[in-house]
Each structure stands twice: as C-alpha cells, then as structure tokens.
Design a protein with these regions (language model features):
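HIT superfamily nucleotide-processing domains
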Residues: 1-132
Length: 132
C-alpha cells in the first residue's frame, strides 16, 4: 500500500530530527527506541508500507544511503566495528509503524556476550546454532 496517511508520524515527520535527506529518503537517529547508540532510521519520503514495494530507483538510492551512513557513523564513533541492517515488513514481523523504514544499527565489540546468529535472534530459539 502506498497512500499517504494523515496520522503517519513519518509522513508528518512528527518528532523527527532529520539529519540528512535524498530524493527518496530522509534519515534520522532513533531517539525513541534505539537498540544502540546512533541507531539510524532511513525512511521513505513517500508513504509506502512494504519494503518490497520500493521502486528500482528507491532501492538504488537506498544502497547509496546505507553506504554513506555507514561511513558517517564510523567517523562519528570510532568504537563502531560492525552493523546490523534490518527491515520489519508486516505486523507479524514486528513492523509497528506502517511506513517503510530501514534500521541501521551500529555494533561495537563486546556490546553483547555472544553476537553469533545476529538477526536470527528475532526468533530466539533460532539464534544459537551449530554449523553442519
């Protein structure tokens, strides 16, 4: 779905301190529910619910935005040693704001005891596994 919603906090940029923008996206730091320091949200300018509905031009721009934000974040904080990139698509996957946004989560050595499994942790029983 891609119709604008009058009460969408991202369409209204409610409580959004925009740090950068492109033709297709605006970028903010997640200050409401950050997973780590400098957790970044890359949000579509147009109202579109589903990541899979992004256009080729939007996907191409997103690639550049992610690379640029990675570079900026590493300049901002030299302790950043890795990243998680995540998208929740649909309520059953945890999407709570029905406006497409991508999480860029900076990671630091030792920020969790055992980072193996990374995004597999969305289903806790699947995070730990042994390679075959």
């Amino acid at each position: 779905m891609s119709s604008s919603s009058g009460d969408c906090i991202f369409c209204n940029k409610k409580n959004c301190k925009v740090i950068s923008s492109t033709k297709y996206f605006f970028i903010i730091r997640d200050t409401a529910y950050p997973v780590t320091k400098h957790h970044t949200l890359i949000i579509t300018n147009r109202h579109v619910d589903d990541f899979f509905d992004l256009t080729k031009d939007e996907m191409s721009d997103l690639d550049e935005v992610l690379k640029e934000q990675k570079k900026q974040l590493k300049k901002l904080d030299e302790e950043i040693s890795a990243f998680n990139v995540g998208v929740n698509i649909g309520k059953d996957a945890g999407q709570s704001i029905m406006h497409c946004h991508i999480h860029l989560i900076p990671r630091r050595k030792g920020d969790v005891e055992d980072p193996r499994g990374g995004v597999r942790g969305v289903i806790p029983d699947k995070q730990k596994y042994k390679r075959k």
